[in-house]
Amino acid sequence: MIELSSAQPTEPISLHWILPPSKSLMARRLVLSALRGEELPSLEALSLEDTPEDIRSLLQALQKSREGSAVINVGESGTAMRFMTAYLSVAASIPCRLEGTARQHDRPIAPLVDALRSLGADIQYIGKEGYPPLYITPRTLHSTEVSLDVSLSSQYLSALFLLAPRLGERVDIRLSSPLASSPYAYMTSSVVSEAGYQWQEVSEGHFVYEPCSDVAHAADHSLLLAEADWSAASYAYALVALLPLGTECYLPQLVLPSLQGDSRYLPLYMERLGVYTEISEEKIRIYRGEQRGGDCFEADMSPCPDLVPALVAALVGCGVAFRLRGIGHLRVKESDRLEVLGSEFAKLGVSLGIGQDELYWEGDLGEPRVLLSPPIIDPHQDHRIAMALALMTQRVGRLRIQAPDVVAKSFPSYWTQLGKLFTIKPL
């Protein structure tokens, strides 16, 4: 456990945050490179301080597979679980078991398994039907038309897109549901296209792959670390929203325009809370100006669900009522994020409304509370809950976070960055 405390500055300050490399871009480029049979980078080649645990888990899983391991464990990484399911179905050297943590085994994977089976994959459930762990025997996939339910995760579609180097014939994918987190799927399509493989969206929800012989050169591993993570940047934006007018924060390696979907929404949403974005070469400067928001902030967050925790912290911290829709699939993340956001903000005297597909708040902080001891936040092993709630230190003065190491999943140096403003001590 750690305790955070803030002097709650009243004058503008200047911050400089080092963000981790883009987790979503790194994961896709690693898997695509592996499926093309290219040499994988070593863990030593990546910065251990900045490389998200998700990426380390994925890279270790790919390396284990190439070494002929019969058991692949991806830990907490949902990204690795979904991408490795597709990868192992065609590229494993021997039949193997794919597993993770207990929470990982509660996260559904049936839509992806069903789609892969329709392509000829041999995947069996070891425990509960529709959930990991899995037993996968590699097969050559064949041409077919695939129906895919993507209501819970766009990574099901991304996993299929990444298989392009191993598809020898035309494949049609038809979506049977609205696409959750759609920018991530289009990012995958763009990454695959960079390597010379083209998925065409011939009509809404209908994607076609036609093999071609003209593909790009081997992957450039320097691209893995070239661009900072926009989801991680949301915590810097949210923090600046809670600080005095004139506060600024420099974010090196954050790029606009970017393939990362969150880059399209975060600056727009945070501008309504008075955080403005200034673009310069190889860095972005954000600064605190006047708020532009109205009485209530409303948004469909289905394209950018990873922004929800930080955005909720910023909105509550600024006292702005909100209604965020299109987020029912957050219930099957590292935690049930809707319920956990509700329970942990309640410890700060904030009563969030929780629907099946939405989160809302009337902007009422209730009666002022005298906190005799700092609230203790339980992130429920969810990195984004820990990072978002920690920001509320700026409002309550002192806060304790259980299991702080959970942030390593996406932002290993988060406490180092936050320590540039808050005092942080282990307990």
Regions found by a protein language model. Give the residues of each.
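Short, structured segments at the rim of ligand-binding sites
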Residues: 1-427
